[in-house]
Each structure stands twice: as structure tokens, then as C-alpha cells.
Amino acid sequence: MTARKKPSPTLTTLTVVVLTVVAWWIFLGRDVVRDVDPATGNVTGPYGAPQVIACVLVLAALVVVGTLSAPTWAAVLAVAVPFTAAWTIQAQATDDSGLWAVGALLVLLGTLAGGTVVAAVTRVVERRRAARSTTAP
């Protein structure tokens, strides 16, 4: 049985960066309309829970893919930085209050924290699988 060759860490990282921006665009980037409840006047959005959950799941999968073939820090940053940048560009263009900067910081911290947890779990699972495969008869 031949060992699988790992893909280039640089190519993987660049692919994760591009797919992160694509995920942002598909799930969040095109939705800029806030919803107003006609009965109460409450304003919500622009994002709904299902689209945010789907985006988070895709970002987590991208961190896993990146972690399996690139340094952990590169995988986390390859998701957190471009996602935050894409979110920030849109938020800055549509926000007159200046609160986009606070939102950008929170998005960055959230994606860094979430990405770090996903990468850590991925590394633990990867090590356990490697240990099992070397001790298997």
C-alpha cells in the first residue's frame, strides 16, 4: 500500500482563502436587506440563522481541510482573515454609525477562536487515527 502524498501546504492555504471568500459571498455577502416586521416595526437581519449556521459549517470544514495539509496557524488564519476582510468591506460600506469596526473585531475574534477550536480537535483526531494505524495488526 502506498502512502498518500499530502498536497502542497501553500496551495491548500490559498485554496482555503479563496473558498472562504466564496463561502462569505454565497451565504452572507449578497444579503444586505434588513427585514421590518409590519406589525411591530422590529428590524432584523440582514442574516437569518440558517444562512449563518450553514456558513459556519462550511468555514469549519475549510479549517479541517487546511489543518490536515498545512500548519494549524495557517489554516486558522486562511479562514479568519479573508472572512473578516470580506465582512468588513461590506459592513463599512453600509454602516453610517461606525459600529462596523466593533463588528469587524468581533468577527475576527470569533473566527480565530472558532477556527482554533476546530483545528485543535482536528489535530487530536488526526493523531489518534495515526496512533491507531501504527498499532493495528
Please place each PLM-identified region on the residue numbering.
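Membrane-water interface at transmembrane helix exits
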Residues: 28, 66, 90, 118-126
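Membrane interfacial helix motifs at helix-loop boundaries and amphipathic/re-entrant anchors
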Residues: 22-54, 85-109
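Alpha-helical membrane-associated segments of multi-pass integral membrane proteins
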Residues: 96-130, 136
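Canonical alpha-helical transmembrane segments
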Residues: 50-72
